[in-house]
């Protein structure tokens, strides 16, 4: 459960949040000397919210729908609703990636659903960057703070993007923002799922609902509370609190660039402190 104390802390002025993110997307595209942004739309809350924000930031946006046989038909229908909301009927491509996945899996003789699921995410990343390079667009990521902290994304898959506009909003906050933006209720309330295999749900894999997950993340990593206190506040077992904390710790490598072994006086990762937009 989410304590009322945490809910109040996470409830923001979503009008201001919208204005800020839209402005930053627009600025970042300009600073990057790109002409627009491209996004992968799944029909889930994160990609729906980010697509709407992108469409408000620039008229130069493009959307890719990249389903597989494990993609629920409802997700495709929901994605089309968002495309209609952003007037993107002439700004999207529908690419079924089953043939690519099957060929890849056959070549390397893979049947493990998790490995194949990660291949799906990386194929989508490759397609997004192919279109982005062709159009001189940025790849707009859709990950939220909860997923990023938990490491609940594929390294160099859905984590392979140029910018993460909602990356500092917990899943609970993204749902609130979705309500503010007019995202259809069935999308806001839909159980989050990467849909990398049939029946997959994020909350089912993790073993907790996102309101509880977000409460644990907030209380531990923003208020630095002890696990015992967090368990009491969230009415959650101590073991589950520790599980969430450990997910953050063990996924740290996903949030960092590759390690560089220092051999000189100035190693790039540890000593390279130039601005992101340089020159």
From Swiss-Prot:
Q: Name one GO cellular component term.
A: cytoplasm
Q: Which residues of this UniProt protein bind deamido-NAD(+)? A: 122, 155, 162, 253-254
- Provide the binding site for ATP: 40-47, 142, 171, 193
- The EC class name is ligase
**Protein name (record):** NH(3)-dependent NAD(+) synthetase
Query: Entry's SUPFAM superfamilies?
Result: Adenine nucleotide alpha hydrolases-like
Specify whether Metal-binding is a keyword of the entry.
Answer: yes
Keyword ATP-binding applies: yes
Q: Which Pfam families match?
A: NAD_synthase
Question: Which Gene3D superfamilies does this one have?
Answer: HUPs
HAMAP family (UniProt xref): NadE_ammonia_dep
- UniProt organism field: Sulfurisphaera tokodaii (strain DSM 16993 / JCM 10545 / NBRC 100140 / 7)
């Amino acid at each position: 459960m989410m304590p009322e104390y945490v809910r109040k802390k996470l409830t923001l002025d979503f009008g201001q949040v919208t204005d800020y993110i839209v402005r930053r997307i627009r600025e970042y595209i300009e600073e990057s000397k790109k002409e627009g942004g491209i996004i992968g739309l799944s029909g889930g809350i994160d990609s729906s919210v980010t697509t709407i924000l992108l469409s408000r930031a620039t008229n130069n946006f493009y959307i890719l729908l990249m389903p597989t046989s494990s993609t629920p038909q409802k997700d495709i229908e929901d994605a089309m609703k968002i495309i209609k909301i952003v007037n993107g009927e002439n700004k999207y491509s529908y690419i079924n990636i089953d043939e690519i996945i099957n060929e890849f899996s056959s070549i390397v003789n893979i049947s493990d659903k998790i490995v194949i699921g990660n291949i799906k995410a990386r194929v989508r990343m490759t397609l997004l960057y192919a279109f982005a390079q062709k159009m001189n667009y940025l790849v707009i990521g859709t990950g939220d703070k909860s997923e990023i902290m938990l490491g609940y994304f594929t390294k160099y898959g859905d984590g392979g993007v140029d910018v993460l506009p909602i990356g500092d909003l917990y899943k609970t906050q993204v749902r609130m923002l979705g309500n503010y933006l007019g995202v259809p209720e069935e999308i806001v309330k839909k159980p989050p799922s990467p849909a990398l295999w049939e029946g997959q749900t994020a909350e089912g894999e993790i073993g907790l609902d996102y309101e509880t997950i977000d409460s644990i993340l907030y209380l531990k990593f923003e208020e630095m509370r002890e696990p015992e206190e967090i368990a009491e506040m969230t009415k959650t077992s101590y073991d589950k609190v520790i599980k969430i904390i450990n997910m953050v710790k063990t996924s740290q490598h996903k949030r960092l660039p590759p390690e560089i072994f220092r051999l000189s006086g100035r190693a790039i990762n540890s000593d390279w402190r130039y601005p992101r937009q340089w020159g």
